[in-house]
């Protein structure tokens, strides 16, 4: 038994170190609370998505507020030639708090030609847990949990960033959970510039984006599929996402605003 004690000690140290606050936690900027920029009103936004300049998908996004609760819904899928090659229909819903800009739950349904994928993410003050259910399934779904807070969804991360002053050189660092994984996201404010969206030239705030993967032991890993990213937020009273580009392992992908209806209600 005494011979085994050193092994137990090593295992104990390994587990203890995994549960300690990770070194990167000191870089997270969300402890200061939300900024003072007003929260957006109810709205409908339409985006087109593509790869290397070619439109491949479209989605409608609805933002609805009721008291302190905020519901963000997105519905879309592949279009045109891309749909013939790769069929995808997506429904996404996020519930969050307006006061804290923190999410409570995300449910996402992805319907492909040969399978359906449902991802449920639950956020709490202790951690975040996700379950991905694939149909037809080869094995039962397994949950994934990270014990860290606060954690944002993609849309609430945007709410957080837009609430801040967004002065040139400012950096916002936060933990974002999307699909079935966690990431350390860094958003750096590059400055103000103009960008053409459709036929209109818009005043915009340019940001640079960086992501690192976070494993279940809160260790940072290189996100191999993502090389670099950038985005443009409208420099006005709305601060809506105008365009996002990401350099990935097969070129670059983008999302661009096609239509914005402030005050619109979901039909």
Task: Walk through the language-model features, giving the residues of each.
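Compositionally biased, intrinsically disordered low-complexity regions enriched in proline and serine
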Residues: 8-9, 48, 159, 178
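Positively charged n-region of N-terminal signal peptides that target proteins for export
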Residues: 1-5
């Amino acid at each position: 038994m005494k011979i085994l004690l050193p092994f137990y000690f090593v295992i104990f140290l390994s587990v203890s170190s995994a549960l300690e606050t990770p070194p990167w936690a000191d870089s997270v900027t969300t402890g200061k609370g939300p900024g003072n920029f007003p929260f957006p009103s109810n709205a409908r936004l339409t985006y087109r998505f593509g790869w290397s300049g070619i439109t491949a998908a479209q989605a409608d996004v609805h933002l609805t507020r009721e008291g302190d609760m905020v519901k963000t819904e997105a519905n879309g899928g592949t279009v045109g030639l891309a749909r013939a090659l790769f069929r995808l229909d997506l429904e996404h819903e996020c519930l969050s708090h307006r006061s804290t800009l923190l999410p409570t739950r995300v449910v996402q349904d992805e319907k492909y030609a040969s399978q359906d994928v449902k991802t449920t993410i639950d956020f709490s003050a202790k951690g975040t847990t996700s379950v991905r259910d694939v149909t037809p399934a080869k094995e039962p779904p397994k949950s994934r949990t990270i014990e860290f807070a606060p954690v944002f969804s993609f849309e609430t991360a945007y709410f957080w960033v837009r609430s801040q002053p967004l002065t040139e050189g400012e950096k916002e660092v936060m933990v974002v959970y999307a699909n079935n994984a966690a990431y350390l996201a860094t958003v750096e404010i590059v400055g103000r510039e103009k960008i053409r969206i459709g036929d209109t030239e818009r005043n915009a705030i340019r940001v640079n984006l960086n992501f690192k993967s976070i494993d279940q032991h809160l260790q940072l890993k290189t996100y191999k599929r993502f090389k670099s990213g950038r985005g443009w937020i409208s420099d006005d009273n709305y601060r809506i996402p105008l365009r996002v580009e990401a350099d990935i392992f097969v070129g670059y992908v983008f999302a661009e605003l096609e239509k914005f209806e402030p005050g619109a209600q979901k039909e």
